[in-house]
Amino acid sequence: MISKPDKNKTRQKRHTRVRGKISGTADCPRLNVFRSNKNIYAQLIDDVAGVTLASASTLDKEVKVEGTKVEQAQQVGALVAQRAVKAGHKVVVFDRGGYLYHGRIAALATAARENGLEF
């Protein structure tokens, strides 16, 4: 019987493969993105110390719940960039979490770049 591969399992394989190659430091933290069906989450991570430096998601009160998911991802990208710059982090490494660079992930990344993050 032919079975379809589970999309989330293949994404997790991609993510672990990429995570072996990139990691965040205190000088250049990792901007990690997680996408669920309803929400999107972004956080700056210092992998050496194992600490989250800044985070934002669609569950935050600053993000408006109206609009499409792409618009919400843009708001989350702008918010995490503002919090990162406020904490003193401008240069980051973007970790798309095994997702394709398209749609919500690309919208979050471009909004973060427009609000002061460099990657």
Curated annotation (Swiss-Prot):
GO biological process: translation
UniProt keyword annotations, A-Z: Ribonucleoprotein, Ribosomal protein, RNA-binding, rRNA-binding
Keyword Calcium annotated: no
Recorded coiled-coil stretches: none
Superkingdom of the organism of origin: Bacteria
Listed NCBIfam families: L18_bact (TIGR00060)
Name of the protein this chain belongs to: Large ribosomal subunit protein uL18
Gene: rplR
